[in-house]
Amino acid sequence: MAKPIVAIVGRPNVGKSTLFNRLTGGRVAIVEDQPGVTRDRLYRDANWLDREFTVVDTGGLDFGDRENPFSAIIHKQAEAAMEEADVILFLVDGRSGITADDEAVAAILRKAKKPVFLVVNKIEDFSQRERYFDFYSLGLGEPIPISASHGMNTGDLLDAVVAVLPENNGEDDDPDTIKIAVIGRPNVGKSSLVNAILGQERVIVSDIPGTTRDAIDTAFDRDGKRYILIDTAGMRRKGRIEEAVERYSVMRSLRAIDRSDVVLMVIDASQGVTEQDKKIAGYAHEAGKACVLVLNKWDLVPKDDKTMSRFDKVVRSEMSFLAYAPTIYVSALTKQRLPKILELVDFVAEQATRRISTSVLNELLADIQRVTPAPTDRGRRLKILFVTQTAVKPPTFVFFVNDEDLFHFSYRRHVENRFRETFGFEGVPMRFFIREREKEKD
């Protein structure tokens, strides 16, 4: 089920990033920092009163090209938040009071058909009611005074947010249905690829309204299997004036990734891997989803007998954090290799649900430590005492060790590589958690 999205909207310097960090506890992703992942801390998951949701920050945005009018950019930002988020936090500055930009945003948010909270930041003394009562004039209900930097009243704000979060959308979680998110930056051919895949299917069962309000999820059958394609065709930039708003497109990709079983990460082969490609792929990696790299527009690439191997090397180098993901070169236009896509989808979906018995895992673990013992650190050596698989989708393993500080990243990578060589898990990230069983005395 997709997590609800809470968007923080407001002009620059009102404290959006501070509030973002306060609401999300400043968490870091569970996954290890790995070379090659371009991380964009635009979003983080949060949990309050046992409700999970994703907070999206527009902090750090320069409201763009100063030649463009502020009002137009703010207008687009607010519209994007209205379209994509489930709950909107409109943050204003209690010290500076109401500005023309605040009024411009409020005028748009008053039309929103979803909860909007007017949050007045930088209020350290709640007895100074006049500092935030003026904001009633924005027509967005009762202002909620907070101090994001000190955490004052943010608990009450979270209580209010959780109270209006949408309930479980009742999505079909049929384990036999594979949900496929087709993601990628604008103009890489996502829509063409979706249409080409569907065009090959004899039976298109139905169009299902998705959780993103203007998206359509398409269900279809092939060879007795049910698939749902999650449409992210709306992820596109519409002009330079929306430079700031482009970051809101991440909300659609987040929704799609969150709801999916398998992610098709579409890259324009004629342009190669870009920084934006790496950011979007990083979302899927951090979400723990099975992934297939689809290099589209292969028909536009001049070729010789070594072209594909050269591309493979470049893609693996640029996206080293997705080394586990299979790659396929296709053309939505000419239909080249399109049937292979669903074969790979089936394969990585099965890999994501693999479960290895504890006894087999520990047999391999003993062999790993016998053949390649962990290096010593100040005279101490890591001992992995026991490992067990605790989850699938993604495969998750808990290691019990003598000293977690000795389980260095390089040795974790070695263990992961041996796990993959032995058990497969192709196309899926693996999660390792380390638990300290004992501290040995020297």
Curated annotation (Swiss-Prot):
Q: Where, by residue number, does GTP 1 bind?
A: 10-17, 57-61, 121-124
Every copy of the KH-like domain together lies at 354-438
| Record InterPro entries | G_ENGA, GTP-bd, GTPase_Der, KH_dom-like, KH_dom-like_a/b, P-loop_NTPase, Small_GTP-bd
- Identify the keywords attached in UniProt to this record, alphabetized: GTP-binding, Nucleotide-binding, Repeat, Ribosome biogenesis
Query: Which is one GO molecular function term here?
Result: ribosome binding
Boundaries of each EngA-type G domain copy? 4-169, 178-353
Residues noted as binding GTP 2 in the record, renumbered to the chain = 184-191, 231-235, 296-299
Which range is the signal sequence, renumbered to this chain?
none
Origin, by domain of life? Bacteria
Q: What is a single Pfam family found in this protein's UniProt entry?
A: KH_dom-like
Q: Name one GO biological process term.
A: ribosome biogenesis
NCBIfam families tied to this protein: GTPase_EngA, small_GTP
Q: Subunit info?
A: Associates with the 50S ribosomal subunit.
Role played: GTPase that plays an essential role in the late steps of ribosome biogenesis.
The family assignment reads: Belongs to the TRAFAC class TrmE-Era-EngA-EngB-Septin-like GTPase superfamily. EngA (Der) GTPase family.
Supply the name of the protein. Answer: GTPase Der
Species for this entry? Heliobacterium modesticaldum (strain ATCC 51547 / Ice1)
